Amino acid sequence: LILVDTSGILSALFPDQNRHHECAQALLSATPPRIISPFVLAEVAYLVQKFGGVDAEILFLAEIGRRAYELAAFDEDDVEDARQIIHKYRTLGVGLADASIAVLSKRYDTFDVLTLDERHFRAIRPAPRKNFRILPADG
């Protein structure tokens, strides 16, 4: 079980990205499910289209349709939890996508996250006395 962040997925998808091989390997070797927040999905889809074109976006969305990732549900209570995380870490500029991963970490009781965003995910505490295990950095 792994949570996926925008930077980790983009790095895994595009060979010219920083740490591509490590991110691709971490993603492929992760035991399913690979959990994606709807906010991360929106970011990834936008950036895949921007840098890879509409055909690349269509291919990525087909992966979601084939359930290569589990698209997590997010309701109003989850948004409130994310808002509280954004407020708590406001000096770091943590946004909704990153905060949603912290919310999902609690729900799924996992601390593994595929990301290159060490600045935010080293600071965010997903649970008392718990840290994220950042992949591929901590792998």
What residue ranges belong to the model's regions?
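Alpha-helix/helix-capping structural signal
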Residues: 7-8, 39, 77, 119
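Acidic, PIN/NYN-like endoribonuclease modules and their adjacent C-terminal/linker elements
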Residues: 1, 108-139
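Short, conserved active-site loops that position catalytic residues or coordinate cofactors/metal ions
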Residues: 37-43
